[in-house]
Amino acid sequence: MTQDELKKAVGWAALQYVQPGTIVGVGTGSTAAHFIDALGTMKGQIEGAVSSSDASTEKLKSLGIPVFDLNSVDRLGIYVDGADEINGHMQMIKGGGAALTREKIIASVADKFICIADASKQVDILGAFPLPVEVIPMARSAVARQLVKLGGRPEYRQGVVTDNGNVILDVHGLEILDAVALENAINGIPGVVTVGLFANRGADVALIGTADGVKTIVK
């Protein structure tokens, strides 16, 4: 199976967690896009979705799925999203698609976070994939200096502006042994909006696409 076929398999497998009549939290990226396609088959059975990016919102609406503002939603049963890396503790690096802030907000309010990924995203130690950090534009250089002190090599993601109007620093060269501590440390730097470490709030379920089928891991 190709990587895209593995992504499609986990996207469709996540449908089993969708309850009729509910509002579903939806992530961003190529794997999440397959989940949105699958969700389109439940149009009319679900109340709608809360979306983590303008791109996902557009795709949901094109399939006829109502999209709600998170402020108008009291409860979110599940949030389904991909990952750039996921370790054995169900901690993740996310944000390759620059939607990390909205992804983290929606994940924080959902009862259950379901991570969908192909097997190439599984790692023992996080950090080979550059860690995205969303930053207020005026603080970019100041934040970069602090990230160097934490052992990273920050690189400005040229030409990218997030849906929130901010910029992204991708931090290379990290070997993340204590993801919770690093997430807290980076969150504490003035000017940081969000770091793409999902450690304090990791995944509850991981659906991993492999050549032998979809593997389910429960926290």
UniProtKB/Swiss-Prot annotation:
Q: This protein is called what?
A: Ribose-5-phosphate isomerase A
Job description of the protein: Catalyzes the reversible conversion of ribose-5-phosphate to ribulose 5-phosphate.
Q: Which UniProt keywords apply?
A: Isomerase
Q: Which reaction does it catalyse?
A: aldehydo-D-ribose 5-phosphate = D-ribulose 5-phosphate
Where, by residue number, does substrate bind? T28, G29, S30, T31, D81, G82, A83, D84, K94, G95, G96, G97, K121
Example GO BP: D-ribose metabolic process
Residue positions of the active site? E103 (proton acceptor)
Q: Tell me, how does this one assemble?
A: Homodimer.
Q: What pathway is this protein said to act in by its record?
A: Carbohydrate degradation; pentose phosphate pathway; D-ribose 5-phosphate from D-ribulose 5-phosphate (non-oxidative stage): step 1/1
- InterPro entries (UniProt xref): NagB/RpiA_transferase-like, Ribose5P_isomerase_typA_subgr, Ribose5P_isomerase_type_A
Similarity-based family: Belongs to the ribose 5-phosphate isomerase family.
Q: Give the residues annotated as coiled coil.
A: none
Q: Which GO terms describe its cellular component?
A: cytosol
Question: Which GO molecular function annotation, any one, does this entry have?
Answer: ribose-5-phosphate isomerase activity
Instruction: Please give the Gene3D superfamilies that the UniProt record associates with this protein.
Output: 3.30.70.260, 3.40.50.1360
**What's the EC number here?**
5.3.1.6
